[in-house]
Each structure stands twice: as structure tokens, then as C-alpha cells.
Amino acid sequence: MGKEVDVSTLEAGGVRDRDYADPPPAPLIDIDELGKWSLYRAVIAEFVATLLFLYITVATVIGYKHQTDASASGPDAACSGVGILGIAWAFGGMIFILVYCTAGISGGHINPAVTFGLFLARKVSLVRALLYMAAQSLGAICGVALVKGFQSGFYARYGGGANEVSAGYSTGTGLAAEIIGTFVLVYTVFSATDPKRNARDSHVPVLAPLPIGFAVFMVHLATIPITGTGINPARSLGAAVVYNNSKAWSDQWIFWVGPFIGAAIAALYHQIVLRASARGYGSFRSNA
């Protein structure tokens, strides 16, 4: 049975009687933002959130490696520690907590790839995106530096939480893992923050941070054995800067190119395929 969409309704700006409204696209360059305290408050929130994220997660990784080190913890060390599951929970849980805390201030990006995807979708201006990325990168460096400062011996011994392509995996495999993992994350961000979903679920404020944190958890389970899981260029940069190892630096490009490609694909998929305006395509017919 055929079903027609009313073209006049579409041309008027969307379906009538909607209980939500799409926000207008952010300007590409908004110089006026530089004079607003709300921008700098958001930048500070991104810095602090990324610092806390890196401190907790890298400390968890270092602690796990120490607990499973037979030379330090005895012959049964392999059976102790939080395991990969615990590491994945640390990353996913911290993202859930920090997105919940900062969503109303900065949007809770905590990741340059997320910021890049939202910029491509015109959710944030170029000025805000660049300041967020700088704050996230600096926060990540400071967070890892705190771990090194408090656990200097363990930090150097157990790799500093740096991302590298693991032995047995090719560069292409590592890059693909980062692209797909970041796509999952950024796609989840777009879906969880969709205006239509927010209008329906606004009475349950945890429903946006929860799937985002869970996406981070699931991606870590899949990609920790391959790359240690980047999907966040700031996280990878912070560990590389403080650890300062040649292998971490030689693989660093993977943890920027991969996440940015994954974020771009997710943004295009959400904006062009899932949220495409009917105005751009004329009338539609469904023969379902």
C-alpha cells in the first residue's frame, strides 16, 4: 500500500505538531563567542573533565599491569587484577560520570573526535571546536602527568598507558579498529543527543550519558587487544607526551587519523542519511 508524504508540510519546515525543534546550525566562525563567559566556562569544564578522565583510566591501566606482573605480585598474578573487563568499565564508567556532570555546561565532549564530529554537523562553531580540542589535549597531558607524578616507578615500568598497535597486528588493522570504534562512539553521541529523543526522554536525564558510556565500554572490549583503544586523540596524545616513547610516537598518527575519519563518517551518516531534511529531496513515497 502506497503512502504519500505531504510535500507542502515538508516545505513548511517539517512535520506538523512536532513536540521537538531542531536547533539552528552553529555559525562556522562566531567571533562574538570570544566575549562570552559561557564559552570559557565550557572550555574549563572540558579541561577538568579530560584531566580527571585520563587520571582515573591511566591509573587503572597501570594498576592492572602491576597486579598481573608475576615478578612483582607472585606466580598467581595472572589471575588477579581487574582484567580487560575492569579497564573497559573504568573508561566507560568515567565517560558516563563526566558526560553527566558536564553536559549542561560544555556538552560533555571530552574527546576531540566527538568535537570534530559535532563541528561537521554544525552543532558547534569553529572557534568553540578549536578551544575545546586544545583544552581536551592539555587536560589529557595534565591527567597523565598526575599519574606519573604519583606512581613514577610503576608508570615507567608498565608503559604509561600509551596507545600502540599491538604485536601481531598490522598498521591497517589498527587504523581500521580506531575508525570503526570511533564511528560507534560518535554515532551513539548523535543518537543519544538527537532533539527528537531529548523531547521524549527529557524526564530521564541519564539517558544520554548512559549509552555514550556504554558505547565506550563495548569499544574497549573489542579493541584493547589491538591498539589499547584510542578513539580519543587527546587520550592518546596525553599518554604519548608524558611517556615519550618512540613506538608510541610512531603510531600516534593512527590515533588521530582513525578517530577523525570515524567521527566524520558518523556525522555524515547521521546528518545526511538519518536526519536528512525532506526539503532537500522533494516528495517521498513509501511502498511499504
Curated annotation (Swiss-Prot):
Motif NPA 2, residue range(s) on this chain: 232-234
Segments passing through the bilayer: 42-62, 81-101, 130-150, 172-192, 206-226, 254-274
Residue ranges annotated as motif NPA 1: 111-113
SUPFAM superfamilies: Aquaporin-like (SSF81338)
InterPro entries referenced in this protein's UniProt entry, alphabetically: Aquaporin-like, Aquaporin_transptr, MIP, MIP_CS
Role according to the record: Aquaporins facilitate the transport of water and small neutral solutes across cell membranes.
Domain notes: Aquaporins contain two tandem repeats each containing three membrane-spanning domains and a pore-forming loop with the signature motif Asn-Pro-Ala (NPA).
Full protein name: Aquaporin PIP2-6
Origin species: Zea mays (Maize)
Gene assigned in the entry: PIP2-6
